[in-house]
């Protein structure tokens, strides 16, 4: 099946942003933007869980309980992500690289399932990663699943309201092409945040 013309630029943008974030996390190099490779060291566990300010929300062991201001650790397995029931605190707590990458991975994986899978997964089924290597691998797998789901879409699907049944957003009220656009925005802005946190970690005095 050929790609719907409207999907082509969105898929191209997704592929670019996904590759750029993966390279920024795993290395060994990253395209500087003009074709020049820049050396990148792999994300470490210490960096993954680094809390640059007091009161961060992060990914934590369920056995340790939620962090400051959070009331629950959401997710299956040994680790969960800090959160509260809606409405969330104002101002929003600062979130760690681990929190942001976990959130991004979850939204990709769950939306893939609610587009071309069982349409049943929830946040309680998602397993947050407690170490950097597992988190990067989980992100890559979730991005691959979302991309595969996009390849099932035709022009009719793109215009279908509620085609993606993801339960934690406005997907039920939106045509699918708007969900595809929104996921790209999530990837772009969280990817930029994650890249900045890597820079801050590199240059911050921590000892």
Sequence positions of predicted segments:
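Acidic/histidine-rich alpha-helical segments that form the ligand environment
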Residues: 127-160, 177-188
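Short, contiguous alpha-helical
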Residues: 1-125, 164-207
């Amino acid at each position: 099946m050929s790609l719907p013309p409207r999907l082509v630029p969105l898929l191209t943008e997704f592929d670019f942003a996904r590759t750029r974030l993966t390279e920024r996390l795993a290395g060994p190099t990253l395209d500087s933007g003009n074709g020049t490779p820049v050396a990148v060291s792999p994300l470490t566990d210490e960096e993954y869980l680094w809390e640059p300010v007091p009161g961060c929300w992060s990914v934590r062991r369920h056995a340790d309980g939620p962090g400051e201001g959070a009331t629950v650790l959401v997710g299956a397995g040994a680790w969960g992500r800090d959160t509260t029931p809606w409405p969330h605190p104002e101002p929003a707590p600062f979130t760690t690289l681990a929190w942001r990458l976990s959130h991004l991975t979850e939204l990709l994986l769950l939306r893939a399932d609610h587009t071309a899978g069982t349409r049943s997964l929830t946040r309680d089924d998602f397993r947050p990663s407690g170490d950097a290597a597992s988190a990067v691998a989980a992100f890559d797998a979730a991005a691959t699943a979302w991309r595969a789901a996009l390849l099932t879409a035709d022009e009719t699907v793109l215009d279908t309201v509620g085609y993606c049944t993801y339960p934690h957003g406005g997907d039920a009220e939106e045509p699918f092409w708007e969900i595809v656009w929104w996921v790209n925005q999530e990837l772009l802005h969280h990817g930029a945040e994650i890249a900045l946190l890597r820079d801050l970690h590199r240059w911050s005095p921590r000892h």
